[in-house]
Amino acid sequence: MLLAMYEDPQGRTTPGLWGRIACAWAVAFAALHFFWALGGSWGLSVSAGPLAEERPGWFVAVGLWGVGLLCLVGGVLGWLLAWPRPRGRAGRMVRALGWCACAVLLVRGISVEVLLLTDTAGQGMDVSPEQRLWTLLLWNPWFLVGGLVFGLAARGSGKAEGLSSGAA
């Protein structure tokens, strides 16, 4: 259905789809953070280590609620990237923010991956083997996927011509 909504004259799927995928990625990440903020624990212990058990107020407020809200802002950005870009400064701003989201997510994913694989941070980081494994196999790839999706959405921003009318 989504693919049928955005087709260019040559019959290829246009990049507007990537904006919708970026939106879904961000909203899913927000939902997970809100689940954790409300007391859920699935996956948090291997992500946040001791903070997951202690749950200090600053961690819940900033690390869970704050990040969840930031992810919702990312969802709005992904949605905006899916639609025809407004002319002028607003359109350039949306696209620039898409590229910024791409860069931040890729840098975060790659840098943490490199730090964990090379053990550059040393023993001072207090990262358990279980945390390291889940971070390398699940969390960092999630950031890398998000970065790639936002990059593809920003690259194609403004190229979508809107919903096809169904007429050939």
Model-derived segments and spans:
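Core segments of alpha-helical transmembrane spans in multipass integral membrane proteins
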Residues: 24, 30-31, 39, 55-80, ...
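Membrane-water interface at the C-terminal end of transmembrane alpha helices
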Residues: 141-161, 168
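Interfacial loop at the N-terminal end of multi-pass membrane proteins
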Residues: 8-12, 32-64, 85-86, 122-130
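Individual transmembrane alpha-helices with interfacial aromatic-anchor signatures
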Residues: 60, 96-100, 128-146
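Structural signal for membrane-spanning alpha-helices in multi-pass inner-membrane proteins
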Residues: 33, 75-78, 112, 150-157
